[in-house]
Regions:
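Signature of exported/secreted
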Residues: 1-213
Length: 213
């Protein structure tokens, strides 16, 4: 859950947790994949996530999550097919920072959104460190998760009534450029670098204290 506390000096955004709370999240991502500069394919990735708040301590929550990832490759498959199931357990604090074992493959993006320690209002911007994590087992035979840092830019765009709900609207953007460390010689092709751009609009339900969409 996300809590947005309105005050005269602005809004303080923070997560809050209730022991035993359970909820589901569904996300869909559209991406264009390029290999060696040439477009390989476009795909839609559907994530269905179940979350169990197993423990709460000092304002942080220990979240036990099950991820079901499905994919639809445009021009090849008309329907989504199940790609992978994952389980992850991690702590997340009031601002959104993760404490998680490095062996977990999910979630792919960590510490996003990360809220400022003080209050914010529409028009404010900030930046914060985050992390991407990728599963290269199937395509490249890399058994451990690949981690690399990203720098995320945030803009508090506005407050908006969306489907009857008063929301705080954030624009979240970052670019990736990561050279993959050389691995032992292999007969399989290995990635040299990973580049990309992520842009998302994030809506927080101010009254309910939850992510709206």
């Amino acid at each position: 859950h996300l809590e947005a506390a309105d005050g005269g000096e602005g809004t303080r955004l923070k997560y809050r947790y209730a022991p035993g709370e359970k909820y589901r999240i569904v996300t869909e991502i559209s991406e264009d994949v390029f290999i060696n500069g040439a477009r390989s394919h476009s795909s839609d990735i559907l994530n269905k996530i179940s979350v169990d708040t197993a423990e709460v301590k000092n304002g942080s929550g220990r979240l036990d999550c099950f991820f079901r990832m499905s994919e639809r490759i445009q021009g090849r498959y008309e329907a989504f097919f199940l790609k992978e199931d994952y389980r992850s357990v991690f702590w997340r604090d009031e601002r959104g920072a993760f404490t998680i074992d490095q062996g977990y493959f999910m979630p792919v993006v960590r510490n996003v959104p990360l809220f400022p320690p003080g209050t914010v209002r529409p028009g404010d911007t900030w930046s914060a460190a985050a992390e991407e994590v990728h599963d290269l087992r199937r395509g490249y035979g890399v058994e451990r998760p690949l981690h690399f840092p990203v720098r995320v830019q945030y803009s508090y765009l506005r407050n908006e009534v969306r489907e009857g709900v008063n929301t705080a609207v954030l624009m979240i953007e970052y670019n990736t450029f990561h050279r993959v460390p050389a691995a032992a010689p292999s007969s399989r092709p290995m990635p040299d670098k990973i580049t990309g751009t992520s842009v998302q609009t994030w809506y927080g339900d101010i009254a309910a204290g939850t992510m709206h969409s």
